[in-house]
Regions:
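The conserved beta1-alpha1 loop
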Residues: 22-26, 88, 225
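Conserved hydrolase catalytic core segment
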Residues: 82-124
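Flexible "cap/lid" loop of the alpha/beta hydrolase fold
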Residues: 108-149, 233
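Conserved HGGG/HGGXW glycine-rich cap/lid loop of the alpha/beta-hydrolase fold
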Residues: 17-59, 81
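Conserved serine/cysteine hydrolase catalytic core
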Residues: 172, 182-241, 252
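Conserved alpha/beta-hydrolase catalytic His-Asp/Glu region
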Residues: 144-203
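Active-site loop/oxyanion-hole signature of alpha/beta-hydrolase fold enzymes
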Residues: 48, 52-86, 116, 125-128, ...
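Catalytic histidine-centered segment of alpha/beta-hydrolase-like enzymes
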Residues: 253-266
Length: 293
């Protein structure tokens, strides 16, 4: 047996088996790209991952990400017990939407800088889709044209390290991305994450998230926001605040803070999970409960 503190500092026993945590990645970043964050979380959790959303032919990308939600739910159903859901960007949003559809599969949800597009922004985005402007007004247009082939891994490393966004990553984080994001081909290496899938995901960002905000969310949900996240400013925080209430904390960093500060991200994620699980147990039983039971 092990021990854990409740919210009232009362020590109670819990089984030594680690709580089940499922992590879902952001668009264009296979789950292995988050190696440093996930290794840190593995100290306390049984971490499972979705490798690359949108690449299973059974779940082709469709509008409002409904098939990506189906894909995640299909994986969660194999566990036989509810999991703690954590996801970055795309992954956090899909995790939240999966938990909304199937709350029996989730203990709580932690969203890492994920888009919750609601209100007037959702209406503008819906109209843009109807007018055929989705590719022009999303990063999908850039994704389709981005370079994805290099003569060697070293050349790919030099390419990414020349960009300020990757220079801000923690030591070793770019190696994780290349180790899990490249595959060999006859003339060098290429990105595993298909550019067309990436573009399709961007251009099908849900415009219907207001539906999940109408009633109290069925499981506890929290949000960790990057203070310098351009993507979060574009999506807005109004919908996020309606969704998570007081369960919102910030971290100094951009949208890619899980790669910039993996250790701090893991720490804040642990703290948020503890808060959310306690809220869930108190709601069910009317008493404080083990944070990592």
């Amino acid at each position: 047996m092990g021990f854990v503190f409740t919210t009232r500092s009362r020590v109670i026993p819990f089984p030594m088996s680690k709580p089940l945590l499922h992590f879902t990645h952001g668009n264009s970043y296979p789950s292995g790209s988050y190696g440093r964050l996930l290794d840190d979380l593995r100290r306390d959790f049984d971490v499972r991952t979705t490798d690359m959303l949108g690449h299973d032919p059974r779940f082709p990308v469709r509008d409002n990400w409904h098939t990506l939600i189906d894909e995640l739910i299909a994986q969660l159903e194999t566990y036989g017990r509810p999991a703690i859901l954590v996801g970055h960007s795309l992954g956090g949003a899909v995790s939240m939407l999966a938990a909304h559809r199937r709350p029996d599969l989730a203990r709580c949800v932690v969203m890492l800088d994920s888009p919750v597009v609601a209100g007037w922004r959702a209406w503008v985005w819906r109209i843009a889709k109807l007018l055929g402007l989705r590719m022009r007004l999303s990063p999908g247009n850039v994704a389709q044209r981005r370079r994805n082939v290099w003569p060697s891994r070293a050349a790919a490393f030099e390419h990414f390290m020349a960009k300020p966004v990757f220079q801000a990553w923690a030591p070793g984080a770019l190696d994780d991305y290349l180790d899990h994001g490249l595959v060999p081909q006859p003339d060098g290496v290429r990105l595993r994450f298909d550019r067309d899938v990436e573009a399709a995901i961007y251009s099908t960002l849900p415009h219907d998230m207001d539906r999940v905000l109408r009633d109290p969310f069925p499981v506890p949900v929290g949000f960790i926001a990057g203070t310098d996240s351009t993507e979060l400013r574009q999506a807005g925080l109004d919908g996020t605040r309606r969704l998570v209430g007081d369960n919102l904390v910030t971290i100094a960093g951009t949208h890619l803070y899980p790669m910039e500060k993996p250790a701090l991200t893991a720490q804040l994620t642990r703290e948020m999970i503890a808060r959310l699980l306690a809220q869930g147990e108190e709601k069910k039983a009317g008493r404080p409960a083990a944070l990592f039971a």
